[in-house]
Amino acid sequence: IQFYCKEGLTWTSLTISSLSMRYVPNGYIFDAKGPMCFPINAADIWDILGYTNSKIINIFLKHLAPTMDYSQGPVGNVPFKSPTRNITNIIKELVTIHKNDWDTNEISFEFQTNILVKLANDYKKISDGYTFRENENKKIIYRVKELEEYNNSSFIDLFELNDILSPEVNLSDITLDRAAQENDIIKMISYSIGCMMGRYSLDREGLVYAHEGNKGFAELVAEGAYKTFPADNDGILPLMDEEWFDDDVTSRVKEFVRTVWGEEHLQENLEFIAESLCLYAISPKKGEPALDTIRRYLSTQFWKEHMKMYKKRPIYWLFSSGKTKAFECLVYLHRYNDATLARMRTEYVVPLLARYQANIDRLNELVDGASGGEATRLKRERDSLSKKFNELRSFDDRLRHYADMRISIDLDDGVKVNYGKFGDLLADVKAITGNAPEVI
């Protein structure tokens, strides 16, 4: 316990790859899965970090830990010699580069803003910003290669192992995040949704709102925390495969792009986003407008990416009517309160039922006056809408039941516990909680 919250080095004890030590600043604790070591002489920490990430360390560990169980015993028995070269600044630079790289991810505690959004002041075309980011990323990767090879050579020379070891580092072994057009756009979209929810803001860097029950959110709005790009009023964002609501996610993504990159290149930027998403996330459709492609990604793939990013502990929860996707929406768990479901019902589900019914009635009239292929097409459209209507009506019955219960959540219980409180209103309940949802 006397070492808790002290500066040290940590590593993953069970791994199929080589040992990789990481620097831990003051303020953190550790456990058996992520053990830590502490230098007797604090000034040696950078030399030890360089040594335990060099090629030399693996020679010793092949004999001390042949099963690749890097527990404290084998690691503690590795002999250490301080290098004759001064590598302190080299190792500090490597730590800074890797930390800055990690902090570009939303899941980092020190995440500030999205890379492409940050570049928007200088590049009004997202494609130009991405090209700059890609070139800078390559420079950093080659800088890391240079630094790691210097570190390797320092210890190879020290142990006189030049005949059996090369200091060369393969680019594939450098663990920095690579610039990738599709991934960078996916991250930008995720950040934009964070801004819609109020988790992030274009006016403030870092995490802006992550309290409980929407408490204090109105005060943030009053302070002007979301002045440039207003956050959603209730933290409920419709995620629809068609445009049924003015404030659905797709419409707000377009608004976000306009706000950040401006009006002049809006269409070109939307097309770049759509093109990027079609590189891997979704298949391209010939002649499909850019905004429709973005909508298709959001309605079919965003949730999967979000689940992957947050390792099945999502912060935006997907409420779904079911298989036909008659209604789906995202709710930010930190803004959820016991009135959220009632609002979801009155503001979205009930009005959508009325719209579905009106469209079914309209299609019935058109079917009566049509013939041949046109009649067949209209009937197919009507039948599809009828299925959605029936699914949504069933969802509304269940939603009303849970809304009347005025369910509260406690963030201290974690996502796994809280996500299971809403029966089958939510998507992928079993994947998140481990149990099948309660069906009423």
Residue ranges with predicted function:
Residues P74-I156, L353, Q357-N364, F389:
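Extended amphipathic alpha-helical segments enriched in small hydrophobics
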Residues L14-N77, N86-I97:
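Basic, amphipathic alpha-helical recognition segments used for DNA target recognition
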Residues D69-P74, I107-K118, S172-L176, A210-N214:
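A glycine-rich phosphate-binding loop feature that marks nucleotide/adenosyl-phosphate handling sites
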Residues L9, S13-T15, C37-N41, P79-T84, ...:
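Short, flexible loop/turn elements at secondary-structure junctions
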